[in-house]
Amino acid sequence: MRLGRAGIVLGLLFSISSQAQDYHAIEGSPFAGSLGVANNPASILMTPYPWDITVFSLQLKTSTNAVTFHNLSLLHPGDTTEYSFDGGNKRRFAAYNFNLHLLNVRLALSKKAAVAFGTNIRSYAAIRTGVANYNDSLQNMNQFFDINENTTYNANGVSSSWLEAFVTYSRTLWDNETSRLNAGLTLKTMRGISGAFAQLNSGSVERSVSGARTIYLLNAGNARYGYSSNYDRWKNGRSTMDNLKSFLGKTRNGAALDLGAEYLVKTQAVTNYSDEDTYYDYEWKIGVSLLDIGRNTYAFGNQSRTASNPKSNVSDSALDVKFGDPGTLAKFNDSLATIVNNVGGMGGVFNIWNPTRLVINVDRPLQNNFAVNANLSVNLSGSNSGKGKSFFVKEMNLLNLTPRWETRRWGAYLPIQLTTDGKFWVGSAVKAGPLLLGIHNWANVFLKNKMQNGGFYMALIIRPGHGFAEKEDKQYDCPKY
């Protein structure tokens, strides 16, 4: 398989690649509208507008302890940017997520029922290793094995990217003087654009001495890797547009759903019933949702492989020669066949489950347009170390706490988040009319070695100039004089 430059770029975009989906500033906000449906489908009932349209929104987040970028920040995009692999004896990870929302529309049918629909492009990926030692002075595999005596090597990586179209329905289940319960359901039809996985299990080497030299020989382990077959359709000599048509044409359908509910504890203060917005007032709002219950299916590409039972005479120097510059995946596979006793292709299909998770959100309004929101996200996905043909992508976010000041037109937000890998970030966001701009980690702005951990989001949301105009039966209204 040889993709060429455009194919490589496409592969990086789709394969190394995200509640609202990481738009942390507006989680729980009554003004989130169509952008909030991804965090809880019931939330679309708690927006004081008859409609709103997210023309587009874009979110990117990365997190790693394996790589550091140097001389780079949002304030200083230097010309001498470099990167290095982080040293130390530790587990390593790199995770990435991305989403693009296009024309997401929310329509209030009444104050007690609403719908939303739109299209999204989403991409998730993560690579994780077992404990291994590394430093940037290593020159070859012999030196690497030397500082990793008695290490058992394990690693796995999964990526999935897809296009989805969704429709959401939400309605009020009960509404009394003290509380209200809203529930919502989102149905999604998906098209898997790109899928890939890789595994290394129980790899080990055996130390041997030959004269004054220490040699390491392969001892045990098994590996497998696969990718979606549409990459095989990318051909050199064809135009990029023709390749894209062929690439996207060889994809499969999938389906997913979201479930959510929001429970409101109403304010018991005296309210002005002539003010429409008092309908949306609450003391507490508690949301619970199950998100991304579904999967994408991919056919195996021609160069997908499984390998086991290493040959006993393969030395560290042989690995340097055979894999120093593999060039293409086909050449890599040819080299792999010379160092193991069992190697074969992989046929049929594999599944990658979406980042299924339980989300609990609590929102507490304060005085003078201030509020605070807490959001807990718990991944419900399985392990990527198994022997089956089902794999999982996962959400990076674990816990967020977001103080905010917000009106219809303006907003300032301070999301504080803890990731599933223990990263602690302080971000911020601002809303100015239809525009929302945010960053996940302030360190991206000021420090020149933190760009690998963080990201940004932006959204353009169109809303009407006035609030909800309730459509009521006017037959019993008093006549106007």
Features from the language model and the residues they span:
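Subset of outer-membrane beta-barrel
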Residues: 21-481
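Bacterial Sec-dependent N-terminal signal peptides
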Residues: 1-25
